[in-house]
Amino acid sequence: MKGLKYLIVVVSICASTLLHGQMKDTIAYRVEPVNNWVFFGDENPVVEMVLVNNFMNMQKSNLSCVISKDTGEPLYTFKQQSSVAPKDSATVSFSFNAPQPGFYSVVFSADDKQIKKFNIAYEPEKIVSPYDAQKDFNSFWDLTILQLHEIKPEYKVVKNKALSGKYRTVYDVTMKSFEGETIRGYWAVPKGKKNYPAVITYMGYGATPWAPDVNTPECAKMAEFIISVRGQALNQEYNKYGDWFTYGMSKKETYYYRGAYMDVIRAIDFVYSREAVDKTKIFAQGGSQGGAFTLVACALDDRIAAGAPHVPFMSDFVDYEKLGKWIGAALRGEAKKQDVELSKILETMSYFDIKNFAGKIKCPIVMGVGLQDIVCPPHTNFSGYNLITSPKEYYIYPKNGHSLPIKEWFKVRENFFDKFL
């Protein structure tokens, strides 16, 4: 087939190095993340499998590799029989022409048994998912924000001695948001400082509430507001929105995320109202649903100086419906429940789709992506990211799914925000 090729390379390596001290009578398989599984330009994507022969005699392996689009459509199938010398190894490499920018699924099987499945990326910054915002998108959100501003926040701030620590004092915050809904959060303030930057942390979908860091020196750098949106986390006890995602989906005016997005803005209102906060240095961060909230905050409110979303949710529902099992089932189920075409549901969702907010973002953005994410597939992350025109950068973690390596990502995020302090 034109554009396809494979390469077999046999390499002798010390058995103790290969097996990490394990001596099992079996052929072992190990995937090598060539180029961290992200490819650009003229370079063909390459996938490799290392075969380790633990036997004392020659062994054969019937290896197959299937390359598919992230939608599941098969593109290429490779088959190769390999002979591996006793206590030796062989590296099998397959390369292929990626037909277009995007993410591709790779499935390795040996003797018809699946042994490894993973995703690779090709030119993710060139993925095209055009705006599908309705004509009244901007006016809808302008009106919604005006309605939020008609609600007096009635901030209540009470010191929480139990959660306070060496470097920061924590306060329980209660306030009124869109349509009079009460929402809650934790406000952590650096001790001994009269002026400081602040970061708003938006939480993931259904996340269990967590307290701010108060006992490591790094946390003294800025204040932090961890906000719980309506019906979730600190507000779970008062939840009247069911499973949140499908609540009120029949109309844009009643959909759950209309109010939740306004809770995102109300959190900014609170931080901005604090006298000691440096108003030019308010940041936003969060993962999954919190990543979506971070991007919404940056799009709808120019008081945010920079944003750091990771594995963002709520993006590119037209493609998300095909890529995400849970989301696809939820959207199709809602269409069936309402007895309407799926296109009608997607029209409603377009008002809440992150990619339709992306062009409104003016502040710098850094995004973290889990290449193996099946909850918020990386395609959907880049659908919105690629429409952002402000300064931006991204980090792809090749072996991670919906959870990034915490220490690594936190360091990236910290260094990013430090540039604006």
Residue ranges and their predicted role:
Residues 36, 148-192:
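N-terminal cap/lid segment of alpha/beta-hydrolase-fold proteins
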Residues 194, 207-268, 319-328:
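Cap/lid segment of the alpha/beta-hydrolase catalytic domain
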Residues 277-287:
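Alpha/beta-hydrolase fold nucleophile elbow
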Residues 291, 295-340, 396:
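Hydrolase active-site cap/lid region
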Residues 82, 92-99:
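Short, hydrophobic beta-strand segments
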Residues 185-189, 195-206:
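Short beta-strand element of the alpha/beta-hydrolase
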Residues 375, 382-421:
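C-terminal catalytic histidine-bearing segment of alpha/beta-hydrolase fold enzymes
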Residues 360-361, 367-369:
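Short beta-strand/loop motif that positions the catalytic acidic residue
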